[in-house]
Regions:
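Surface-exposed, low-hydrophobicity beta-strand/loop segments enriched in small/polar/acidic residues
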Residues: 1-154
Length: 154
């Protein structure tokens, strides 16, 4: 009887935006998408809205709430987004897959763009620094999947 050839990579396989990246400790909170927010794609940074326990899709600089975590229990018709008034899971601390808008390196600082994307490019007028966050993987180009680590103690 022949045995199939099996091999395993030592690297974690790539995930998808909004997927929890590792089993390291993480903290996820439940919020509600503001009625005035646009649809929030998985893996996008969100801002606190003015009403208690609500978040919104960024349209300008605001107070960073966390990263939208994938929820596979949402109706298929929603697509891969949270809609206004949906309950949303927001990662505050831990490791999550996101799309890096530019090439990043491990340990680089993380900045959020006004549309909720993530970069390592500083721009005080448009890309605020996310405190205690760092890139946990390396990319070689634009719009590539990367691990973002929130709540880093240095």
């Amino acid at each position: 009887m022949a045995f199939p050839t099996v091999s395993y990579s030592r690297d974690t396989p790539a995930g998808y935006p909004g997927m929890i990246a590792t089993t390291e400790p993480h903290h996820i909170i439940s919020m509600v998408v503001s009625g005035t927010s646009g649809n929030i794609p998985f893996g996008i940074g969100v801002l606190f809205d003015t009403a208690e326990d609500t978040v919104k899709l960024p349209t300008a600089i605001g107070k960073f709430a966390g990263v939208a975590v994938v929820d596979r229990t949402l109706p298929f018709a929603n697509g891969e987004v949270y809609k206004p008034y949906d309950q949303i899971s927001v990662m505050k601390n831990g490791s999550i897959w996101v799309t890096a808008l530019v090439a990043v390196a491990q340990g680089d600082p993380v900045y959020m763009t006004p549309t909720g994307g993530f970069t390592n490019v500083a721009n005080a007028a448009a890309n605020p620094l996310i405190e205690n966050a760092e890139w946990a993987s390396v990319t070689s180009g634009v719009n590539q999947l990367a691990r973002l680590r929130l709540g880093v103690t240095k």
